[in-house]
Amino acid sequence: MSDQANQGDLEIRPSPLLTVINDLHSKYKSLKEGIVANYIPELAKVNPDLFSISIVTVDGQVYQVGDYQQLFTIQSISKVFAYGLALEDHGRDYVLTRVGVEPTGEAFNSIILDEQSKRPYNPMVNAGAIATTSLIKGAGATERLNRVLEMFRRYIGHDVFVDISVFTSERSTGHRNRAMAHLMLNFGMIDRNLEEALDLYFQQCAVMVNCHDLAVMAATLANRGVNPVTGEQAVNSRYIKDILSVMYTCGMYNFAGEWAYKVGIPAKSGVCGGIMAVVPNQMGIAVFSPPLDIRGNSVRGVKVCEELSQQLGLHLFECVKVENGKWGVGNCEC
């Protein structure tokens, strides 16, 4: 298991930050808390000992340790990027008519909709993500899927593919998601073929990535939508504020408040065991470890991010005095 690897044009160099993540990896690799997601049969087969940490900065430095090349399905982390694509397709005002931006305090698979508006509460829970995905433009199912895959390519810097076995597993067992979609169809929050919208949602969740890919995607968001590897604009910079705001308030499900209090940066988790976090204008962080807590967040991932935030002063409200006598935010030196 290596703590460094050449990845595209990124520069890898010795750093105190590499020491920090190596120490955290060593500290938590023997942790046995949590269970692997089993409500999707294919996910239940994953090795619970897989564990990696990757950090990519906005100027192209990379630090990583563990199984960072291990592929896994992106799952709910895809919701962040589908939301960005829907914003580009329709603009924030229209998207807000279909999905809100309020935290729910409920589990990620809650069927509850806003009582007054009948909208799903936010795009980071399943109901909201299904509504968001249904907004993605295209002449047909194939074009919409190709647009989603092309979107991921811009964020990551290379082509991606859908794991067909996971897609079919989710499709055949996704009765709760199907119930949500029918409820939203009833209230006019979905207005196209329901099964087609669900298929695209299941497909985007089954896109294969690794921990390094997630860190590049997070760094792209930290870099105002510009991929630090390729220099390509992955998403219009005007929507970065929208995306990061919803990640901050809703990205960790019914753990979002405690996450904001302890870690204090925008993040999104997935039942794959991934957590992707964004330090605006500085870096993207990704942790992969399949065992989950009762809220559906990676046990090791949460602990690593909490310690990184504390050690590096990453909390958005962590004010430190800088040389010119003014107050700044964060205390990260890579």
Swiss-Prot record:
Substrate binds at residues 76, 126, 170, 177, 201, 253, 271. Its EC number is 3.5.1.2. PANTHER family: GLUTAMINASE. InterPro entries: Beta-lactam/transpept-like (IPR012338), Glutaminase (IPR015868). One of its GO terms (biological process) is glutamine catabolic process. Gene3D superfamilies: DD-peptidase/beta-lactamase superfamily. This is Glutaminase. Belongs to the glutaminase family. It catalyses: L-glutamine + H2O = L-glutamate + NH4(+). GO terms for molecular function: glutaminase activity. It comes from Trichormus variabilis (strain ATCC 29413 / PCC 7937) (Anabaena variabilis). Keywords: Hydrolase. Homotetramer. Pfam families: Glutaminase. The lineage of its organism: Bacteria, Bacillati, Cyanobacteriota, Cyanophyceae, Nostocales.
